Swiss-Prot record:
Gene this chain is encoded by: hugZ
InterPro entries xrefs: DUF2470, F420H2_bilvrd_red/Heme_oxyg, Haem_oxidase_HugZ-like_sf, Haem_oxygenase_HugZ, Pyridox_Oxase_N, Split_barrel_FMN-bd
Function of the protein: Involved in heme iron utilization. Catalyzes the degradation of heme to biliverdin, with the release of iron and carbon monoxide. Release of iron from heme may play a crucial role in the pathogenicity of H.pylori.
Subunit structure comment from the entry: Homodimer.
Protein name in UniProt: Heme oxygenase HugZ
Disruption phenotype: Deletion mutant cannot utilize heme iron for normal growth.
Residues reported to bind heme: 245
């Protein structure tokens, strides 16, 4: 079976392998490209006479019969990497799947606070709901333009601990007075979550504040060789500037 895979890749998929070398190894001019081996963790491609690059699968292949699908998934990822419209839709859906968000804030005394807060949205604007007694409140109040938020995939849903999908934004925080905007945001939150677990109770607590999150530039990482910079409504593939990682190309 392994010999058939190697023969097939070398006979029919040299261009696909060149795409993989470019995406995962920053190899822009590859010659004498050859598929060398495959194992449950990944593949090895040879190029330029005496060099090789190992590329890991997104998840371990348990059955050798599934090598074909794992290799196809790798090859298809090259084209999908440049499907920026698809990435834009994925970013939107990823954000909408969260009811809380990770925060990094700068406390007035200079130390950084890492925390999380419940997340609300009216369909266009995102908000967090924060108590004055929370440690991150002082940072949001005193340094509202020095905030980062992160949407981080649940580890139990990720293909690997090092492949957790994440979306991070530099963010401006704006405090919203209680009124029409407050009610619209909180009504949407209750509708989405069902309002259980104390959510309806904290709505009336006056030491809690609704804070709008105005996202600035960000980065979306969805897997190996799949990082994207975000600025407003524009998305750019990081790899277009050259792969940022250094690889050990074996001879």
């Amino acid at each position: 079976m392994l010999n058939r895979i190697i023969e097939h890749m070398n006979a029919h998929h040299v261009e696909d392998m060149k795409g993989l070398l470019k995406k995962f190894g920053q190899v822009h001019h590859a010659e004498n490209v050859a598929f060398k081996s495959v194992d449950p963790q990944g593949i090895v491609i040879g190029y330029n006479h005496n060099q090789t690059l190992r590329i890991e699968f997104n998840h371990e292949v348990k059955d050798p019969k599934d090598y074909k699908n794992a290799i196809i998934e790798l090859c298809q990822s090259v084209e999908k990497t440049h499907d920026l419209k698809g990435v834009e839709e994925e970013v939107k859906a990823f954000k909408e799947s969260f009811d809380s968000v990770c925060l990094a804030t700068l406390h007035p005394n200079g130390h950084v606070v890492c925390s999380y807060a419940p997340l609300m949205s009216d369909g266009k604007q995102y908000y967090i709901y924060v108590s004055e007694v929370a440690e991150h409140f002082a940072g949001l109040k005193n340094n509202p333009h020095n905030v980062e938020v992160m949407f981080l995939e649940d580890e139990s849903k990720a293909k690997s601990a090092i492949l957790r999908k994440r979306l991070r934004y530099k963010t401006n925080a704006r405090f919203i007075e209680r009124g029409a905007e407050f009610d619209k945001a909180f009504d949407s939150f209750i509708e989405k979550t069902g309002g259980a677990g104390g959510i309806k109770t904290i709505r009336a607590m006056q030491d809690f504040h609704l804070i709008a999150l105005d996202f600035k530039e960000g980065r979306f990482v969805k897997g190996f060789g799949q990082a994207y910079d975000i600025l407003g409504d524009k998305i750019a593939y990081v790899g277009d500037k050259g792969n940022p990682h250094n690889f050990a190309h074996k001879k």
